[in-house]
Amino acid sequence: MSRARGALCRACLALAAALAALLLLPLPLPRAPAPARTPAPAPRAPPSRPAAPSLRPDDVFIAVKTTRKNHGPRLRLLLRTWISRARQQTFIFTDGDDPELELQGGDRVINTNCSAVRTRQALCCKMSVEYDKFIESGRKWFCHVDDDNYVNARSLLHLLSSFSPSQDVYLGRPSLDHPIEATERVQGGRTVTTVKFWFATGGAGFCLSRGLALKMSPWASLGSFMSTAEQVRLPDDCTVGYIVEGLLGARLLHSPLFHSHLENLQRLPPDTLLQQVTLSHGGPENPHNVVNVAGGFSLHQDPTRFKSIHCLLYPDTDWCPRQKQGAPTSR
């Protein structure tokens, strides 16, 4: 009996020890709820760039190259047509005094005192003066045209607005389908090297940004242009291309919107004429090379077709025929 009690007591003690051990074990803590996921912040849009300042007409310097003998037949037409709508932009560079022209153009008629003979030296002399006057003006764009060009000032402004004047921009139309070569010479005539480059023909017009024009200064300013042209024996428009491409490594941007008398102007689609930047005509030597446009003037009344183009662009001009103006169509 005593043995049975002893065994029972031992069993009770063992059970009590086991219960005590269980009570001493750490109880598991309740798991904290997972934090709710917050959506990642949406990426910030880049700050909007301020709109580029719009180009104003007086940001552009249009240089018209002419000669004394053309003041009557050619310049009178330009003054009556496109220059009348772009007076603040246009500067006329000639080679002789003309009180009547100066009365119309004021200080925007510049006598270059260059020779009136059409030689390489005379052409480069005028371009040199054009360049210096542009730099002096502080304007953003330089555009050169001849006195047989019609300039659509609105199309020109629209085209230039696509570019920054601080970048290297040389816009125009080459008259050749390949680059030309120039042989660089040093004093004494020793050949140095041959350079290939494109150039925009002056007869169609071309434009330079101020940023690029300033880089041209060592070879173009204060008479240096004439020295550079003489070094490579090239005329004015070719020398511009030589400086830009051959010396500075910039590139001509070919534009189909510039036109000279060297191309077949009758092939221009009539419905695109009012979008072109410059137009031209064949002159007395090639009177049939004109744009194909209908208007209130016959070919006899308007042999260059400049008046017809002008009245389509500016039908409010007081001398334009008082009729309904439509899109350009073939004659």
UniProtKB/Swiss-Prot annotation:
GO terms of molecular function: metal ion binding; O-fucosylpeptide 3-beta-N-acetylglucosaminyltransferase activity
Annotated segments matching region Disordered: 34-54
Keywords: Developmental protein, Differentiation, Disulfide bond, Glycoprotein, Glycosyltransferase, Golgi apparatus, Manganese, Membrane, Metal-binding, Neurogenesis, Signal-anchor, Transferase, Transmembrane, Transmembrane helix
GO cellular component terms listed in the entry, alphabetical order: extracellular region; Golgi membrane
Topology with respect to the bilayer: Single-pass type II membrane protein
GO biological process terms held by the UniProt record: animal organ morphogenesis; cell differentiation; nervous system development; pattern specification process; positive regulation of Notch signaling pathway; regulation of Notch signaling pathway
Regions crossing the membrane: 7-29
Subcellular location: Golgi apparatus membrane
Keyword Glycoprotein attached: yes
Keyword Manganese: yes
Record-listed E.C. numbers: 2.4.1.222
Disulfide bonding pattern of the chain: 114-125, 143-207, 311-320
Cofactor: Mn(2+)
Function according to Swiss-Prot or TrEMBL: Glycosyltransferase that initiates the elongation of O-linked fucose residues attached to EGF-like repeats in the extracellular domain of Notch molecules. Modulates NOTCH1 activity by modifying O-fucose residues at specific EGF-like domains resulting in enhancement of NOTCH1 activation by DLL1 and JAG1. May be involved in limb formation and in neurogenesis.
PANTHER family: FRINGE-RELATED
Name under which the protein is recorded: Beta-1,3-N-acetylglucosaminyltransferase radical fringe
Species, as recorded: Homo sapiens (Human)
Gene transcribed to yield this protein: RFNG
